[in-house]
């Protein structure tokens, strides 16, 4: 499958030596358009939307429409928590498999149900692997994941490598929304060492500038900032740099 416009943009930035900043907005408690514009002006590369249960595609389309009316030009990528998060007005979707789920539905069942919808809507699909590490949060609970222990970074790296061998072009290490601590640096470093093509992004529990910087230095291609952006935009901006 050929690279789409959004994925080409992300890869071109990484290839030029930049690190990615992915802003995450939950459509149930969305980040305001003005705040999204602030992040856009300060280097955000894409806006991820999704992850909530209590949301319909209409809610997401309405939110995207508000963002565009307010002048937000960032590429908008769906970060689906389920079929209810697939909306036609997005630019792309992280077409994800939850690699360490114990439930086949989250490994392949949801993807089979989603594929015809994504195709029909003409969304750019970015083949992605979602891997829950440590705390896991709501994503780990809903997805029936067997979270990788914080102290076993080599297991996270093995999952990442398996994902790349299976065709994933983006690997997303997730500690969980609002997690007490982020994905460990050694897990990021181990995965970065074995991945040759897939982009590696890390999210969950990143509350300080140093936490983001450490993971980027360890080899992550980008960080995902969500809860912090909702609660303290200024601090989130510092963490993304």
UniProtKB/Swiss-Prot annotation:
Pfam families: PcrB. It comes from the Archaea. GO terms for biological process: glycerophospholipid biosynthetic process. InterPro entries: GGGP/HepGP_synthase_I, GGGP/HepGP_synthase_sf, GGGP_HepGP_synthase, GGGP_synth. It comes from Hyperthermus butylicus (strain DSM 5456 / JCM 9403 / PLM1-5). Sn-glycerol 1-phosphate binds at residues 172-178, 204-205, 226-227. GO terms for cellular component: cytoplasm. This is Geranylgeranylglyceryl phosphate synthase. Mg(2+) binds at residues 26, 52. GO terms for molecular function: magnesium ion binding; phosphoglycerol geranylgeranyltransferase activity. It catalyses: sn-glycerol 1-phosphate + (2E,6E,10E)-geranylgeranyl diphosphate = sn-3-O-(geranylgeranyl)glycerol 1-phosphate + diphosphate. Pathway: Membrane lipid metabolism; glycerophospholipid metabolism. Gene3D superfamilies: FMN-linked oxidoreductases. Prenyltransferase that catalyzes the transfer of the geranylgeranyl moiety of geranylgeranyl diphosphate (GGPP) to the C3 hydroxyl of sn-glycerol-1-phosphate (G1P). This reaction is the first ether-bond-formation step in the biosynthesis of archaeal membrane lipids. Its EC number is 2.5.1.41.
